């Protein structure tokens, strides 16, 4: 079964928006990792917004990607904000990860 997935990046003076639509899983995560890596490597602007409101599915690969992005941005001095679709939020809820835990994950370096 072929699923549709798209990742796009938009950069303004204030922020970088990395938007994803479709299914975020082991097959599509490398595209998102590349976009995040490019944004961090550019080193400006220092605000990244993950717009994952268009995701229809997210597996544990997406959870790992979000956690590693929180840490990576914190270590690089970036502010990170995110918008999650209901399916993505359900994936986080299923494993007990909530916004406050995500934020503290980046702060304490756990």
Describe the function of each predicted region.
Residues 1-57, 61, 67-110:
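STAS-like cytosolic regulatory interaction modules
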